[in-house]
Structure formats: structure tokens, C-alpha cells
Curated annotation (Swiss-Prot):
Record's compositionally biased regions (Basic and acidic residues): 70-90, 410-432
Gene: dbp-9
Identification of the protein by name: ATP-dependent RNA helicase dbp-9
Matching SUPFAM superfamilies: P-loop containing nucleoside triphosphate hydrolases
Family according to the record: Belongs to the DEAD box helicase family. DDX56/DBP9 subfamily.
UniProt xrefs under InterPro entries: DEAD/DEAH_box_helicase_dom (IPR011545), DEAD_box_RNA_helicase (IPR050079), Helicase_ATP-bd (IPR014001), Helicase_C-like (IPR001650), P-loop_NTPase (IPR027417), RNA_helicase_DEAD_Q_motif (IPR014014)
Region feature (Disordered): 1-97, 410-444, 633-676
């Protein structure tokens, strides 16, 4: 019984224990659920309190994400465009002239000229011109602009003549200078070498009569090369017909306007057929005002090509220097550069005017430095011949007068005021009868710093700084052409040294520092830099006395005589001997243009050689022990042995020493006879 009671008491204990646990668990779970509900209710309450702030944040996040996505898309698009551009440039670099769609005969002529691949200007401009579009191209000098407009013009004429062989003037090429006209005409002849029967060209810049030009134009040449003034003169007279003109080209377009051809260009534009002339304009520098003027004259809707950024690799081969020096130091530095051969190779020296060019030439002659002068007073045939011979390596130094650089003055308003004041003064002088004598006639269509293709020029020296940064660009563009290396050296007169040396001072040098500042700013935009030209001034001073001796000998009278003498010689050569040299071309090589002009000038033999004591130590070591140097008073040949030989043999007029013979000298004492 006791056991049962124990069991009975045990059983309910076993049963009742989990019930109490369940109750405690339920109570704990209920408490937890209540706490969670409270926490949830607490967390929900602030969201319900600020729904607007969260929406704004969400909108901002979505907008930022969209902006980031758009930026990524734009960057990817730009990268794709760059990759496509690089790929297209690679593909374009592999193009040949036959791939451009030119006539096969022109491609054959191009191959004969040793042109391997088209340049960037040619790759971009030729397809546009062949498609009939107006092209306005801005590219650096020496980039092949001439072929870029000549080849599509010739190709279009050949294509037209295949179906319509009617002869008429199809193309008119306008250039600012006679020298450039001759160069373009020669390029046309070279490119049309295999189609001479189909293409006829003419140049209107020669000094011939109107009757000769009329007979030349009567055959209706396909291509005419001329300056605007000559072209309008022949159009106005009826000798040149432009009624069916298809192509118009302006080479060095900005210079055409700067040379004062505005009125001629406007007249030519009026005479052209409306809406049917394809226009191409080429230049290395084009200002917006000039663009607007030219567009108003000729272009409908031109395609702009600005290719200046593509030539950075070639620009690295052009090294630019400047040296700040006094006006007399210019002559000393020039003497040292050429006499000591600090710069080797063909050089172009630019000066401000013609008198200065001849003064520098006569100065160089004192030191036996040969050079030739290129200026507007020389006949056109002589100027062309000098350029050709320089390109063939006959001359090493050309001194070019760049009077035309004045037309690039950037402050046009002040320039117009000066011209108006000058016109008023001239009018007053004419009224009073006090006008000065008219200066020598100069060719208004002369220009050497623009467009002329000087070949293999090692250095360009700005003996006198140009008047504008634009003119500077075209001067230095004569060197470092077609991927070759070159040097540009500019001599700048500081404002505090201006006018200190009056015999060599000119007014143009007063603004040298301002022009240099403009040039440096312009070159900085093109990622180029002008560096100072460093040299040892102490060593330079040792040569100053020689420079002063030579400079004193070059007087104004000597300069005037040299100018008149060369003009007389060149006129005789150009007119009288022109036919003779055409019949005897081998004798043309004997006609040189770098001969001495200062025949009546005081000659100083000691200046023609540099003594070794003036040279630095390296120069002295270069002389060997056997080289004794220059002996100025040593006589050539043994005069003592030759003197009197004619007399000894009885020659007529000899100076024998008391020898017998018809021509010998007689001893007066031995032949003396006393009269009886």
C-alpha cells in the first residue's frame, strides 16, 4: 500500500512538472513576442513620421546612379571614338595615291616624282575635292598643300575630257606672288607629264606684252596660274574667259587679302558663273575675319580642315632659338656664325629692307663669305633662277628682304590711321611741290617668306625680327620641311638697347620685344618653345675689332653702287642672254649670282682669314704642327727668277739686267760716246 501511495504520488509529480515548464515557456515566449511587437512598432513609427525625407534620398540615389551610368557611357563612347579614329588614321596612313581615286596617269606622274605615300593634308583634302565639295584647309607649311589641290583639279579635267573634249578654261589658280606662281606652274607640268595632250596650262605672271598673253590665252588653256591683279586684268580685257570655269583655287589665301587684292578678288568673284564653281582655299594661317571675307566672295558651304595638331612629330625637329643683343652685336654674331661655321648647311637670312640686305652682303664680302641677295628689285627670271640654284646647292646663303612682312601688322586700325596720315602728307607735299623723289621700282608681287618651297634649308636666321607673329610662322616654315630637322634663330633688340648704335639702327627693331612676346605666346599654344641661344661673350669680344673694321668699310655710297651694279648686270643677263642660254644651257652654270659687288669698296685682306690666336683652345688644337696658318703678305710664285726673262731672250718690253738683245736694258755708261 505504501508502494502504491508512493507510485501514486510519483505519477502526479511526473505529470505536473512539465505542465509548470510549459506555463513558464509560454509566459517567456509571450513576453518575447510582446517585446518584438513593441520594437517593431517603435521601428515603424519613425518611418511613418518621415516618409518624405526617405523618398528624396531614394530619388537622389537613383539620380546619382543614373548620372554615373551616363558618365560611364559617355566615357566609353569617347574611348570608342578615339579607338576608331586611331584605327582610321592607321588605315589612312597605309593609303596610296591610287587608293584616293585619282586618274592612273596622275598616279604614274606622282610615282615619278618619288612621292611614296600621300601626306595627311592630301589624304583628307583630295577625297573631298574629288567629291565636289568646297574645301578650306589650314595646315602647316611644307605639308604638301600644292599637290592636295593640283591633283584633284587635274583629275576632274581628265574625267570631263573623256566624254567632252571641248577646250575651255576649267581651273583658275590664284597665288599672291610671282615666285609662287612659277612654282605651282612647274608642279602642274610635273603632275601632267603623262597627259600633256589632254591638259594645257598657262602662267600669266611673266613680263610679256598683252598681245603675247592674248595669243597665249586664245588656245583656252585648261589651267591658268596667276596673281589676282593679272587675272582680273585679262578677264576685264576679254583675253581670259571664265564663263565655263569649274575650279577656283586660292593658295596662301590670307596673304592674297593682305597684299591688297581685295578689290581684284571682288571683281573676279562677280565675273564667275553662279553656283557652279568648286572652290579650294589653302593656307597655314587663317584668321576668322579673313575666313568671313573669303566665304562671302566664293564659298557656298566649305568643309573646314584644321590639321595643325597632326604634325607634332615633325614640329619636334624644328629647334627655335632667340638671342637678345644690341644692334651692332647682330653683325658680330652673324659674322661668327658663318665664318666659324657654327651653323652648317644652306641658310636663309631675313632682313627688313633692300638696303640692309646689300649692306649685309657687302659686310660678308669683307670676310670672304659668299652670299646672294633676293629682293623685289631684281627681275622675276633672276629671282626664280636664284631659288632654283639654291635648291640645287649652288649657294649656301641667301639674304632675303622681307618688306612684305609689314602687311601682317595685327593692329589694323592703327595701320589704317598711319596710311591715312601718310596719304595726307603725300597730298600736302604734292601741293607744295616738296615731295621726295620716287624710289626705285619694286615688284609689288614679290614674296619669298610665304609658299616658296626652299629645299634642304638647314637654318632660318631672322637678322631683323618680323613685324608680327604670323609672318614669323611663315619665315621659320622655310626650314624643317618634309620631316627634316631645322634651326630658327631670331635676333631681338631689347628696348633699352634700341638706338644705341645709330649707323646700324632701324625703326623696325623698336618693337622686337613685343613681337617676341607674341611669338612665344603663339608657339606655346602649339606646344613649342623658344630657347635662348647661349654663347661665350668673352670669346666673342675678341672678334669685335674685325667686325668694326668691316662695318666701317660698308658705306652708303658703296651700298648704292652695289645695288645699281647688280641691277644693271641682272637686267642684261635676263633680257639679252635669255635666248643664248636657252640654246646653250650648259653655259648657264657659269652665270653665278653670289659674286662680289664691292669692287670699289676698301678691301682688307687680313679680314678674310681668322688668325689662330683668336680661336678658343679647341680651335688651336685643331691646327696641326705643319699648318703655319695664313701669311697675308706672302707672294705667290718666285718673282725674282721670272723677272727679266723676257729681256734675256730679247723679248719686247723685258726687264733684263744689262743683257744684250733687242729688248734688253742697255748700260748708259758703257754706250756713252764723247763727241768730237
Amino acid at each position: 500500500m505504501a508502494k502504491r501511495k508512493l507510485n501514486e504520488t510519483d505519477e502526479p509529480s511526473v505529470v505536473t512538472e512539465p505542465q509548470t515548464q510549459k506555463k513558464t515557456k509560454k509566459s517567456s515566449t509571450e513576453k518575447k513576442e510582446k517585446k518584438e511587437k513593441k520594437s517593431k512598432s517603435q521601428s515603424v513609427k519613425p518611418q511613418e513620421e518621415k516618409p518624405e525625407a526617405t523618398q528624396q534620398q531614394a530619388q537622389q540615389q537613383t539620380e546619382e546612379e543614373q548620372e554615373l551610368e551616363q558618365q560611364l557611357k559617355d566615357e566609353q563612347k569617347q574611348q570608342d571614338e578615339k579607338d576608331e579614329k586611331k584605327q582610321s588614321e592607321k588605315d589612312d596612313a597605309d593609303l596610296t595615291f591610287s587608293d584616293l581615286g585619282l586618274d592612273p596617269r596622275l598616279v604614274q606622274a606622282v610615282a615619278k616624282q618619288s612621292f611614296e605615300k600621300p601626306t595627311l593634308v592630301q589624304r583628307k583634302a583630295i577625297p573631298l575635292a574629288l567629291a565636289g565639295q568646297d574645301v578650306l584647309c589650314k595646315a602647316k607649311t611644307g605639308s604638301g598643300k600644292t599637290a592636295a589641290y593640283v591633283l584633284p583639279v587635274l583629275s576632274g579635267i581628265l574625267k570631263r575630257k573623256a566624254t567632252d573634249p571641248t577646250p575651255f578654261t576649267s581651273a583658275l589658280i590664284l597665288v599672291p606672288t610671282r615666285e609662287l606662281a612659277d612654282q605651282v606652274h612647274k608642279a602642274i607640268d610635273a603632275f601632267s607629264a603623262f597627259c600633256t595632250k589632254d591638259i594645257q596650262s598657262a602662267k600669266l605672271t611673266d613680263n610679256v606684252s598683252d598681245a603675247v598673253l592674248r595669243s597665249l590665252l586664245a588656245n583656252a588653256p585648261d589651267v591658268i596660274v596667276s596673281t589676282p591683279a593679272r587675272a582680273w586684268h585679262n578677264i576685264e580685257s576679254g583675253a581670259l574667259s571664265v564663263a565655263k570655269l569649274q575650279y577656283l583655287v586660292l593658295d596662301e589665301a590670307d596673304l592674297v587679302l593682305s597684299y591688297g587684292y581685295d578689290e581684284d578678288m571682288e571683281n573676279i568673284a562677280r565675273s564667275l558663273p553662279k553656283g557652279g564653281v568648286q572652290t579650294t582655299m589653302m593656307s597655314a594661317t587663317l584668321v576668322s575675319d579673313e575666313l568671313d571675307t573669303l566665304k562671302g566672295f566664293f564659298c557656298r558651304n566649305p568643309t573646314m580642315l584644321d590639321l595643325k595638331e597632326e604634325f607634332s612629330n615633325e614640329d619636334e625637329k624644328l629647334t627655335q632659338f632667340y638671342v637678345k643683343c644690341g644692334e651692332d652685336d647682330k653683325w658680330l654674331i652673324s659674322y661668327l656664325i658663318f665664318k666659324l661655321q657654327l651653323i652648317k648647311g644652306p641658310c636663309l637670312v631675313f632682313v627688313a629692307d633692300i638696303d640692309r640686305a646689300y649692306r649685309l652682303k657687302l659686310f660678308f664680302e669683307q670676310f670672304s663669305i659668299r652670299s646672294c641677295v633676293l629682293n623685289s628689285e631684281l627681275p622675276i627670271n633672276t629671282r626664280i633662277k636664284i631659288i632654283e640654284e639654291f635648291n640645287r646647292g649652288i649657294y649656301d646663303i641667301i639674304i632675303a628682304s622681307d618688306e612684305r612682312s609689314e602687311v601682317f601688322l595685327e593692329d589694323e586700325k592703327t595701320e589704317e590711321k598711319k596710311e591715312e596720315q601718310g596719304e595726307k602728307k603725300e597730298g600736302d607735299e604734292k601741293k607744295n611741290g616738296k615731295g621726295k623723289k620716287k624710289k626705285g621700282r619694286r615688284d609689288q608681287e614679290y614674296g619669298v617668306s610665304r609658299g616658296i618651297d626652299f629645299k634642304n634649308v638647314a637654318a632660318v636666321i631672322n637678322f631683323d625680327m618680323p613685324t608680327s607673329s604670323s609672318s614669323y610662322i611663315h619665315r621659320i616654315g622655310r626650314t624643317a620641311r618634309a620631316g627634316r630637322a631645322g634651326i630658327a634663330l631670331s635676333m631681338v633688340v631689347p628696348h633699352d638697347l634700341f638706338g644705341k648704335h645709330k649707323p646700324t639702327s632701324i625703326k623696325q627693331c623698336e618693337k622686337d620685344e613685343k613681337v617676341l612676346a607674341k611669338v612665344m605666346r603663339q608657339q606655346a599654344k602649339l606646344n613649342r618653345k623658344l630657347e635662348p641661344y647661349n654663347f661665350n661673350k668673352d670669346q666673342m669680344e675678341a672678334f669685335r675689332y674685325r667686325m668694326n673694321d668691316a662695318l666701317r668699310a660698308v658705306t652708303k655710297v658703296a651700298i648704292r653702287e652695289a645695288r645699281t651694279r647688280e641691277l644693271r648686270q641682272e637686267l642684261l643677263r635676263s633680257e639679252t642672254l635669255k635666248r643664248y642660254f636657252e640654246e646653250n644651257p650648259h653655259e648657264l652654270s657659269h652665270l653665278r649670282h653670289d659674286g662680289e659687288l664691292g669692287t670699289k669698296m676698301r678691301q682688307q685682306a687680313h679680314l678674310k682669314h681668322v688668325p689662330d690666336y683668336l680661336l678658343p683652345q679647341d680651335g688651336k688644337n685643331a691646327l696641326t704642327e705643319t699648318q703655319i696658318g695664313f701669311v697675308p703678305f706672302k707672294k705667290q710664285g718666285d718673282d725674282k727668277k721670272t723677272r727679266g726673262k723676257k729681256g734675256a731672250k730679247g723679248g719686247k718690253g723685258g726687264h733684263g739686267k744689262y743683257k744684250k738683245g733687242p729688248g734688253g736694258r742697255k748700260n748708259v755708261l758703257k754706250t756713252f760716246r764723247v763727241r768730237k
